[in-house]
Amino acid sequence: MATHSALTTLSNDLADAVAAAAPSVVQVHGRRRPASGVVYQQDVVVTSARALGREDGLQVRRSDGTAFDAELAGWDPATGLAVLRVAGLGTNPVEVSSTAPRVGNLGIGIARSWSNNLTA
């Protein structure tokens, strides 16, 4: 019974973490299909550089469906990450832990689907 209780607690904690991060997960439009990004700082979104495909005509869509024009601020070929500036996005940044993860720690992938639904 203790294992079942511990797994239930872990499952609930993971669901709470997804719910807390969900508003900060956005859709990024830079190719034919949208990708996901995360609001890292106010009006700053981090996404996959491969998701962009171009430097102009970029858009970010919040969870409520509102779209905003985005500007490519830069990208890092070593990590494959791109940074977008999105004026007036008005979405709170994701809370980032000050503790570095260890190899073997659990991680959760959270994304916005093609229809802008949350997946984890």
What do these predicted ranges mean?
Residues 16-17:
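PAS-family sensory domains
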Residues 10-11:
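Long, charged, low-complexity terminal extensions
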Residues 2-6, 22, 30-119:
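Conserved active-site neighborhood of the chymotrypsin/trypsin-like protease fold
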